[in-house]
Regions:
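Acidic, glycine-rich A-domain
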Residues: 1-155
Length: 155
């Protein structure tokens, strides 16, 4: 699944339904595009996972932990005026990852961003953050994580 925001709409793309036997190569169609409204995407992922009916899930999220969108956050409560969807307000919105945990879908953050955004990753995803220093570490790191999570599910 990937997401991006374009012209005020967040587009979710499902590359493969895990009930199908084909489509493994669709992930290679991924292209980075648009803005990233992480809070909305995380709420959508939570909804999709809860309705899937699967009992055991592994949710890995590759992110730079820098949510940003050109559509502003509306004013609410004591905040009368709209705000940019960036910085602290966007990170607070993206902290919807806690709802995923509450619903039995704990996300594991694969952080590929700048060192300065690591604190945002921890605010959004809690202690389940793994730092990927470079793309070269991706396969080895993710392989070990998946192996560890699968072993934990078996016990």
């Amino acid at each position: 699944l990937s997401y991006c925001s374009v012209s005020g709409c967040t587009v979710l793309r499902e590359y493969r339904d895990y009930r199908e036997n084909q489509g493994n190569n669709r992930i290679f169609e991924f292209a980075a595009a648009g803005w990233n409204r992480d809070g909305l995407a995380l709420r959508a992922v939570d909804w999709l996972l809860r309705r899937s009916g699967e009992q055991q899930r592994l949710l890995l999220i590759l992110t730079d932990a820098n949510p940003n969108d050109d559509t502003r956050l509306p004013g609410t409560g004591n905040q009368l005026f709209s705000r940019d969807y960036s910085g602290k307000p966007a990170v607070t919105d993206a902290a919807e990852a806690t709802a995923l945990r509450r619903h039995g879908n704990p996300p594991l953050c694969l952080f590929s961003g700048r060192e300065g955004d690591l604190s945002s990753a921890r605010t959004i995803y809690g202690r389940d953050v793994v730092r990927l220093p470079s793309v070269g570490w991706f396969a080895q790191t993710v392989g070990k994580i998946i192996q560890g999570r699968l072993q934990a599910l078996e016990s």
